[in-house]
Amino acid sequence: MKSIYKILAITLVLTVFVSCSSDDDTATELTGENSVTLEFDNSVGSDDLLLATSSYTNSQNETLTITRLNYIVSNFRLTNDQGETFTYEKDDSYFVTSEETGNTEVVLENIPAGTYVSITFGVGVDQEKYLQGAEGQGDFLTVAEETNMMWSWQAGYKFLNFEGTFTSETVTETTDFKVHMGSHGSSLDNYKEVTLSLGTDALVSDEMSPIVHLVADANAILDGAHKLSLSEQSVIMVSEEKSPLVALNTASMFTVDHVHNGSELSH
């Protein structure tokens, strides 16, 4: 009798083990392709960015009211848990995110199924794309012009368009500021790339299309690793000294807040 009980117990354990293994295999089986949505949530420090209605004070005791925050993101690459990288189609990989228009979402289509652990993207337009000439820009040239992200074709794209007003201890009257950063043709290359760990795996399959929520901290543009005082210079555009510092600060303003995994119907 004891032998029968022992056999039944072993059979039960094996059945549970096989069942669990089967469930695990099903849970990790990702096939097909789907979209990955990137939500850029603009902030100032720990506060939400509210254009024209809220004021923010930086570490240099300058109080800013921000009226525009537009930036170009491009050249997306996703790396999976096996160390394999999927590079998004280059011609389709240029986007303007604009707090002004409310267009802060980037949708990457036709991403192969997988478990993705990090994302890489550019801030701005790379020289390879720019040197294709105006005829090689496709629809993105029109998008950039319509969102105030161009100087002229010869001068190039504005990678960042950051505007508003400010006051400080030395500038007591409300004063306009403008920070426009770009590569200025091919003579000064301010294009930067950012790589971020997702923290939580982004799962892509024919039934799963994750949303990655990123935070862009506008405070870092002037108050990041490189401190830039509006009281000293309230307009920064074609500056061989300060524009590269703005580019470095801007590239550092992005973090991943969280990843939402789910089916398209559940979003």
Where are these regions (language model features)?
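A short, solvent-exposed, low-complexity linear motif enriched for acidic/polar residues
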Residues: 21-267
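C-terminal motif of bacterial Sec signal peptides marking the signal peptidase cleavage site
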Residues: 16-19
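Bacterial N-terminal signal peptides that target proteins for export
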Residues: 1-9
